[in-house]
Each structure stands twice: as structure tokens, then as C-alpha cells.
């Protein structure tokens, strides 16, 4: 994290530690995360507190908050990188990677792949059976293969 990002996280933490206790509870955490551009669900908040709140106090101190947000921001960065890669494939901007898109990229990269191999790649990632790979399917397969 940059110093600026750390400062942003500190400011969000202080802003939502409304009673100045040095800790934030579940309700305060939800508001703090929204301020940083996340839309956490109630279950996510509960899980985050449970994962971080080692002493069982039901609240999070700044160090715990910083660790959690650092991980979250890393996730967001890798998602942005994956979406950039997606857009390189989706040159016709349909929001999906077609067989034709994949074939073009393979050719540009000098990969000698058969049509069957390319189709297998599409089939592996294609969850909804429409014969193409949408953003979510692409994200999922990239995460699954640990390329990001």
C-alpha cells in the first residue's frame, strides 16, 4: 500500500470510530467500507469481523482494519488487471470472448493451437453454455488457474 492509501484507510477508520474508542463495531465497519468504495453484504461484514477479531471483542482495532483493507485492495487490483486482459480479447466489445476473439489472440501471440484446443478453452470457461466467455466466467477461470 502507498502512504496515501494507508492515510485514506486511517481517515476512514477515525471517521467511523465515532466514540473515539480506537475500535469500530459491525455497523461502523459497514459505513467505513462503503466510504472506501466497497458494497459489503451483512454476512460479509460478520465474517470479516469474525476472521479478524481474534480476541472476541466484537470490534476491530486499526491494525486489524488495515490488514483487512490491504487484502481487499489487493483483490480489487487483481480484478482490474484481469478485466484489462479481458478487454484485450474482447476487441469487438461485445462483452464476451468468442471463439473468433480467442483465435485472433492466439495467432497474434504466435501460439499454434488447433481449433479443437481453442474450443476446449472456451468450453472450460463457459459456465452458462452460450458458447462464449463473459467477464465473470473469465474472472473465475483466471482465479482458478491462479494466473492472477
UniProtKB/Swiss-Prot annotation:
The segment(s) forming the EF-hand domain are 4-39, 40-75, 77-112, 113-148
Which tissues is it found in, per the record? Ubiquitous.
A biological process from GO: cell division
Keywords, A to Z, come to:
Calcium, Cell cycle, Cell division, Metal-binding, Mitosis, Repeat
Pfam families per UniProt: EF-hand_7 (PF13499)
List of residues binding Ca(2+) 3: 126, 128, 130, 132, 137
Q: Which SMART domains does the entry link to?
A: EFh
The GO terms describing molecular function are: calcium ion binding
The record's section on PROSITE patterns has: EF_HAND_1, EF_HAND_2
Q: Name one GO cellular component term.
A: myosin II complex
Binding positions (Ca(2+) 1): 17, 19, 21, 23, 28
Residue sites binding Ca(2+) 2 per the record: 53, 55, 57, 59, 64
| Superkingdom of this protein's organism | Eukaryota
Q: Which InterPro entries match?
A: CALM/Myosin/TropC-like, EF-hand-dom_pair, EF_Hand_1_Ca_BS, EF_hand_dom, RNA-helicase_DEAD-box_CS
What does the function comment of this entry state?
Answer: This calcium-binding protein is found in the basal body complexes (the functional homolog of the centrosome in animal cell). In mitotic cells it is specifically associated with the poles of the mitotic spindles at the sites of the duplicated basal body complexes.
Spell out the family assignment given in the record's similarity comment. Answer: Belongs to the centrin family.
Q: Which PANTHER family match?
A: EF-HAND SUPERFAMILY PROTEIN, MYOSIN LIGHT CHAIN 1, 3
Q: What is this protein called?
A: Caltractin
Q: Which organism was this protein described from? A: Tetraselmis striata
Amino acid at each position: 500500500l502507498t502512504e496515501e492509501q494507508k492515510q485514506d484507510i486511517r481517515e476512514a477508520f477515525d471517521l467511523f470510530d465515532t466514540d473515539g474508542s480506537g475500535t469500530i463495531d459491525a455497523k461502523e465497519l459497514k459505513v467505513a467500507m462503503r466510504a472506501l468504495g466497497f458494497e459489503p453484504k451483512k454476512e460479509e461484514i460478520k465474517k470479516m469481523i469474525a476472521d479478524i477479531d481474534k480476541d472476541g471483542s466484537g470490534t476491530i482495532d486499526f491494525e486489524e482494519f488495515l490488514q483487512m483493507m490491504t487484502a481487499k485492495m489487493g483483490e480489487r487490483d487483481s480484478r482490474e488487471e484481469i478485466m484489462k486482459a479481458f478487454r484485450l480479447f474482447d476487441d469487438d466489445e461485445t462483452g464476451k470472448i468468442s471463439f473468433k476473439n480467442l483465435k485472433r489472440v492466439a495467432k497474434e501471440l504466435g501460439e499454434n493451437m488447433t481449433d479443437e484446443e481453442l474450443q476446449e478453452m472456451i468450453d472450460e470457461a463457459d459456465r452458462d453454455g452460450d458458447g462464449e466467455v463473459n467477464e465473470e466466467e473469465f474472472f473465475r477461470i483466471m482465479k482458478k488457474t491462479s494466473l492472477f
